[in-house]
Design a protein with these regions (language model features):
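Terminal-region recognition feature
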Residues: 1-112
Length: 112
């Protein structure tokens, strides 16, 4: 699973994105919003990607009316496939790709 630090409002995604990871991240976003409706939430991404529908579950939650704080995204190491979309969904002006991070995007395919 990903690492979540509620006190510092930071999430580290260091694995493939699937439904379980998406559910964990969405729950953390809601919990952090309940704790403080304004303070930014930081998401650090080092992921080979994963299931596109799971990534959109996270993205939709980030952009929903239920998550009011800005969500800042940072790419560390690699952001491939669906993880690149997650990185791009961060708050405009607060999407960062560190110097040695690699990005990769390809034609998207839905499962099934």
């Amino acid at each position: 699973m990903c690492t979540i630090d509620h006190a510092s409002r930071r999430l580290w995604l260091n694995q493939t994105i699937d439904d379980n990871v998406a559910q964990q991240i969405c729950a953390a976003l809601l919990a952090m919003t309940a704790a403080d409706k304004d303070k930014p939430i930081r998401v650090y991404i080092n992921s080979p990607g994963g299931t596109i529908t799971s990534a959109y579950m996270i993205i939709n939650m980030m952009m929903s009316a239920e998550v009011t704080p800005p969500v800042w995204t940072t790419g560390l190491g690699m952001c491939y496939s669906a993880a690149t979309l997650l990185l791009a969904a961060g708050e405009p002006g607060n999407r960062v790709v560190l110097e040695d991070t690699t990005l990769m995007i390809h034609k998207l395919k839905r499962p099934g």
